[in-house]
């Protein structure tokens, strides 16, 4: 990334640098009930992407001269927020040994408030599709755990979702992120 100079870290610190990609915005964080109704479900999709990427790093880093028992997760801004949050996530135990959070905080949204905001963000699309006459009714529907909501959400064109341009945020779901988690690895802020 531009904020983390990977080539300089490799040159000056002698480390192996791996940049991870994950879903962004409304594609990465969506806690509408239709997507999270199962007790083991989470709408923290971006974090699940990071979990899989870290599994790949752990399984393959030796091929690049790295040490699978010495992985440091580092992030800047939102990435720093995620690094700090993941340091306390039980799902991430053993996936990395240290974390660095640069210019990030550790605020987690309340899932109910986040779902309400997401429903308001998606409601105009349901109106455009002719499902409802007004956004209030559409938002109310979007807050239900029905399979019809899930099917509609999963059938939306990605460009329409991206065009919403609305921010999404980390939220405590007690699946990936716990409300009261404490860092299980050394964390440099």
Feature-to-residue mapping (PLM):
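Cap/lid segment of the alpha/beta-hydrolase catalytic domain
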Residues: 1-51, 59-63
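Short, solvent-exposed loop/turn and secondary-structure capping segments
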Residues: 1-3, 28-32, 84-86, 109-115
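Loop/turn elements at helix/coil->beta-strand transitions in domains of secreted/extracellular proteins
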Residues: 13-18, 67-71, 94-98, 183-186
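Active-site loop->helix "elbow" adjoining a glycine-rich segment at hydrolase catalytic centers
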Residues: 45-49, 77-82
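Alpha/beta-hydrolase fold nucleophile elbow
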Residues: 57, 64-76
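Substrate-access "cap/lid" subdomains that shape
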Residues: 59, 93, 102-189
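Catalytic nucleophile serine of serine hydrolases
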Residues: 75-78, 90, 103
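Short glycine-enriched nucleophile-adjacent loop
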Residues: 80-92
């Amino acid at each position: 990334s531009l904020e983390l100079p990977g080539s300089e870290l490799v040159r000056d610190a002698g480390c192996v640098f791996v940049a991870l990609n994950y879903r962004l915005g409304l594609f990465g964080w969506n806690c509408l009930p239709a997507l999270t109704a199962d007790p083991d479900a989470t709408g923290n999709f971006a974090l699940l992407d990071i979990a899989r990427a870290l599994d790949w790093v752990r399984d393959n880093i030796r091929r690049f001269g790295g040490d699978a028992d010495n992985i440091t997760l580092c992030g800047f801004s939102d990435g720093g927020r995620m690094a700090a949050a993941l340091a306390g996530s039980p799902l991430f135990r053993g996936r990395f040994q240290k974390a660095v959070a640069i210019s990030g905080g550790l605020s987690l949204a309340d899932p109910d408030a986040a779902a309400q905001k997401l429903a308001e963000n998606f409601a105009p699309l349901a109106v455009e599709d002719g499902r409802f006459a007004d956004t209030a009714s559409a938002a109310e529907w979007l807050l239900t755990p029905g399979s019809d909501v899930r099917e509609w959400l999963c059938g939306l064109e990605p460009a329409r979702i991206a065009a919403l341009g609305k921010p999404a945020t980390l939220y405590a779901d007690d699946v990936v992120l716990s409300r009261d988690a404490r860092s299980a690895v050394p964390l440099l802020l």
